[in-house]
Amino acid sequence: MQATDQSNAVAYRGTGRRKSSIVRVRLVPGSGVMTINGKPGDLYLQFNPSYIANAKAPLESLGLENDYDVLVNARGGGLTGQADAIKLGVARALCELDPENRKPLKLEGYLTRDPRAKERKKYGLRKARKAPQYSKR
């Protein structure tokens, strides 16, 4: 969905989810700055190179990392889930920016939602699958 930002610049939106993290991403023409919940992206992702690379991967695969500012609102989960959700949200926003981007992003796997989530704990068990020790006699 295309919307105008406060500065009358066009913003492209995308939503990403992973585990229990939900992320809303806005791409605005700019210089490549990533802001997550009002903090610089590097600081929010604790300067972890894998988280940062993961979040910026769709932009880098298209060579647009210095053309758009990424504004992120992230809720829930931990840093791993949020970084993966940002990746999906950025990829979806890039598809909205130009439908031609869809094919290369799909081939790289950036548009695939990872369905893995924490399995619920079952009654009678200690965890989701761990059973109490069984004694035959």
From Swiss-Prot:
The gene is rpsI. GO terms for biological process: translation. Keywords: Ribonucleoprotein, Ribosomal protein. It holds the Pfam family Ribosomal_S9. SUPFAM superfamilies: Ribosomal protein S5 domain 2-like. Disulfide bonds: none annotated. GO terms for molecular function: RNA binding; structural constituent of ribosome. Residues 118-137 are annotated as: Disordered. This is Small ribosomal subunit protein uS9. Belongs to the universal ribosomal protein uS9 family. One of its GO terms (cellular component) is cytosolic small ribosomal subunit.
